[in-house]
Amino acid sequence: QVRPFPDVYQRSACQARETLVSILQEYPDEISDIFRPSCVAVLRCSGCCTDESLKCTPVGKHTVDMQIMRVNPRTQSSKMEVMKFTEHTACECRPRRKQGEPDGPKEKPR
């Protein structure tokens, strides 16, 4: 069965969608411990824009608290803790940064 164009177009649009992100990618300084789960599902902007010069960009964000198990591999001890993650609440197609322009601040949920 062929998926109709309006459905294809809508599903590919720039929007916040559930995305799996690695906890260590979000918290790179926490490399000495193991996390369970090792990744979490959060809403992040992704999708296609109508022009290659545009990029799907978050224009609204909020922080969500998630309970994660932290395991210390040296002592084999574990504890539950609350970690903060950034979720995107609104997305827009915005102009891409030109090469050589400085990056903005790294997205940190803390």
UniProtKB/Swiss-Prot annotation:
GO BP: induction of positive chemotaxis; positive regulation of angiogenesis; positive regulation of endothelial cell proliferation; positive regulation of mast cell chemotaxis; response to hypoxia; sprouting angiogenesis; vascular endothelial growth factor receptor signaling pathway; vascular endothelial growth factor signaling pathway
PROSITE patterns: PDGF_1, PDGF_2
Keyword Cytoplasm attributed: no
Molecular function GO terms recorded: chemoattractant activity; growth factor activity; toxin activity; vascular endothelial growth factor receptor binding
Endoplasmic reticulum recorded as keyword: no
Location in or out of the cell: Secreted
Quaternary structure (record): Homodimer; disulfide-linked. Interacts with high affinity with KDR/VEGFR-2, and with a lower affinity with neuropilin-1 (NRP1) and neuropilin-2 (NRP2).
The protein's role, per its UniProt record: Snake venom VEGFs may contribute to venom dispersion and prey subjugation by inducing vascular permeability and hypotension. This protein increases vascular permeability and angiogenesis probably through VEGF receptor (KDR/VEGFR-2) signaling. Induces DNA synthesis in human umbilical vein endothelial cells, and promotes mouse embryonic stem cell proliferation and differentiation. It may also induce a drastic hypotensive effect after intravenous injection. The hypotension is mediated by nitric oxide (NO), which is produced by VEGF-activated endothelium NO synthase.
Assigned protein family: Belongs to the PDGF/VEGF growth factor family. Snake venom VEGF subfamily.
Protein name: Snake venom vascular endothelial growth factor toxin ICPP
Organism per entry: Macrovipera lebetinus
Phylogenetic lineage: Eukaryota, Metazoa, Chordata, Craniata, Vertebrata
